[in-house]
């Protein structure tokens, strides 16, 4: 499948505004905070729902394209570098704190939720989110899980 058809199929899943494919758009996603290595993905997809993520992953699997999940890109590990082009799934739009269960001391959050937002929403219950990287105002829970 050509790149134009791939972009069309991705747009059919998440909408045209949620697919980046122009070089100037992709440059933002060529690396994380580890800037010594850089690779451009073929496309970046910005899903809003789990169903959209599933559909993108199924499409990429069918086409044998690598996928690169990405949080906020604050890691210093180079873990979000595109491999052989590939489709980057940037999860920053899936960013809600869905529930803080103070009684059981846990929260349900989406993968793109920023660490500091979890603490913000837990604070009224006398709780906080313990991981405290220097990037807590930008890094996401999905990136935390992927990196650690």
Please annotate each region the language model reported.
Residues 33-36, 78-83:
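Short glycine-biased active-site loop of nucleotidyltransferases that positions the nucleotide triphosphate
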Residues 3-7, 115, 138:
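Alpha-helix initiation and N-capping motif
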């Amino acid at each position: 499948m050509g790149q134009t058809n791939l972009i069309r199929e991705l747009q059919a899943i998440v909408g045209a505004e949620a697919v980046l494919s122009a070089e100037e758009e992709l440059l933002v996603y060529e690396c994380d905070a580890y800037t010594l290595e850089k690779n451009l993905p073929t496309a970046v997809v910005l899903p809003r729902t789990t169903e959209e993520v599933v559909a993108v992953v199924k499409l990429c699997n069918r086409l044998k394209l690598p996928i690169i999940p990405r949080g906020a890109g604050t890691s210093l590990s180079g873990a979000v570098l595109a491999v052989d082009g590939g489709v980057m799934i940037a999860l920053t739009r899936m960013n809600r704190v869905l529930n803080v269960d103070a009684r059981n001391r846990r929260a349900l959050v989406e993968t793109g939720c920023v660490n500091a937002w979890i603490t913000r929403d837990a604070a009224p219950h006398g709780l906080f989110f313990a991981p405290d990287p220097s990037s807590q105002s930008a890094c996401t829970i999905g990136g935390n899980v992927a990196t650690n």
